[in-house]
Amino acid sequence: MNNRVGISGYSIMLGDEFFMREAISLARAAECLGEVPVGAVVVRAGEIVGRGFNSPIGESDPTAHAEIAALRDAARNLGNYRLPGCELFVTLEPCAMCAGAILHARIARVIYGARDPKTGVHGSVVDLFGVERLNHHT
């Protein structure tokens, strides 16, 4: 059975909406804390293995982005910083810092809810994920 559905030129997997809704829920938690509302989940084999939301203000940490928090949570839960076969669902297009972490973690697929014309590096400003010289592609 084909579990891909094409929408507006994009290919999505059935179930993607469920995981993006979880990321949106985490973004709302960030917003309630006065943070930029971004949430993220890491999924492996249809199961959420990591969750995170933006918290740089509350943690006084410029690296406390949703993607980084979700990657850290997944790495702890799986016992390895390398996360091949995992997918990342995030509400906003990743920035350069997060893209570097995503590449190092060897995430197989990144799904984001909205483009970020100021700092997005999955095509809005540049496309770091498309640079083959970055040697951590899965």
Regions inferred by a protein language model and the residue ranges of each:
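Zn2+-dependent cytidine deaminase-like catalytic core
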Residues: 50-138
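Short, basic and Ser/Thr-rich N-terminal targeting/leader segments
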Residues: 34-38, 84
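Alpha-helical structural signal
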Residues: 16, 20, 38-39, 67, ...
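Short, basic/aromatic recognition patches
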Residues: 12-33
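Small-residue (primarily alanine) positions within well-ordered alpha-helices
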Residues: 23, 27-30, 40, 50, ...
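Short beta-strand scaffold segments in enzyme catalytic cores
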Residues: 38-46
